[in-house]
């Protein structure tokens, strides 16, 4: 599995150009990408990071971490996913960094998702759907989710996001219309971000098969 992640990550380096400022996501596959960034002879101007974890990793390789407010639109964003369907729609948020990931994806011209083959699914929803929630609204949001969907929200106890919020993981969802569900869940008061990347899906998916496959 680690080899598949490494293959996807190293393939993504081909899309990095000198003097770029790139967006960098979070997770085990992205960690391989950051390591590959540190080894490549290409020299980027810096990176916008989606988490404190990735920020620390980038700095270990001497890569300057920049604020999105100061960079404007980014040419490229590279991140992983928990699930990916044939239409490049994603479930993300296993690492609890979904809000910053969605912000950077929206701010980027090209969003490349790097995954191992096991992350491919015919229909999203095999894994729980993470939702970042304002702490005081946790119970309200959970009730609203149960009223609006067939899902079962579970509080990810002990996890606080980099934004100071909590995560509800919604199990047993039948996601037949990802864009519609993303919009509906976003309307619940107290929801900060839904881990469905359907409206802003990936532009390119690199699957770390042997050899890597492009979707």
From Swiss-Prot:
Pfam families associated with the record: Rib_5-P_isom_A
Pathway where this protein functions: Carbohydrate degradation; pentose phosphate pathway; D-ribose 5-phosphate from D-ribulose 5-phosphate (non-oxidative stage): step 1/1
Annotated catalysed reactions: aldehydo-D-ribose 5-phosphate = D-ribulose 5-phosphate
Gene Ontology CC annotation, any one: cytosol
Name of this chain's protein: Ribose-5-phosphate isomerase A
Native species: Xylella fastidiosa (strain 9a5c)
Gene3D superfamilies: 3.30.70.260, 3.40.50.1360
CDD domains registered for this protein in UniProt: RPI_A
Residues the record marks as active site: 101 (proton acceptor)
Family, per entry: Belongs to the ribose 5-phosphate isomerase family.
Keywords recorded for this protein, A-Z: Isomerase
Subunit structure: Homodimer.
Free-text function comment from the UniProt entry: Catalyzes the reversible conversion of ribose-5-phosphate to ribulose 5-phosphate.
Residue sites binding substrate per the record: 26-29, 79-82, 92-95, 119
């Amino acid at each position: 599995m680690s080899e598949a992640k490494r293959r996807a990550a190293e393939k993504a380096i081909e899309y990095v150009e000198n003097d770029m400022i790139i967006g960098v996501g979070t997770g085990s596959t992205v960690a391989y990408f950051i390591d590959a960034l540190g080894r490549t002879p290409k020299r980027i101007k810096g990176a916008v990071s989606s988490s404190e974890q990735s920020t620390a990793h980038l700095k270990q390789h001497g890569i300057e971490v920049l604020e999105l407010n100061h960079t404007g639109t980014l040419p490229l964003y590279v991140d992983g996913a928990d699930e990916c369907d044939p239409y490049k729609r994603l479930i993300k948020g296993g690492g609890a960094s979904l809000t910053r990931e969605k912000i950077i994806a929206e701010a980027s011209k090209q969003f490349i998702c790097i995954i191992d083959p096991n992350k491919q699914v015919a229909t999203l929803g095999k894994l729980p759907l993470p939702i970042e929630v304002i702490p005081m609204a946790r119970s309200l949001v959970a009730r609203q989710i149960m009223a609006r969907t067939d899902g079962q929200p579970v509080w990810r106890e002990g996890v606080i996001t980099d934004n100071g919020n909590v995560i509800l993981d919604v199990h047993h969802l039948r996601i037949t219309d990802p864009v519609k569900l993303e919009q509906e869940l976003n309307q619940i008061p107290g929801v900060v971000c839904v881990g469905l990347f359907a409206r802003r899906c990936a532009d390119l998916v690199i699957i770390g098969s042997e050899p890597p496959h492009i979707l």
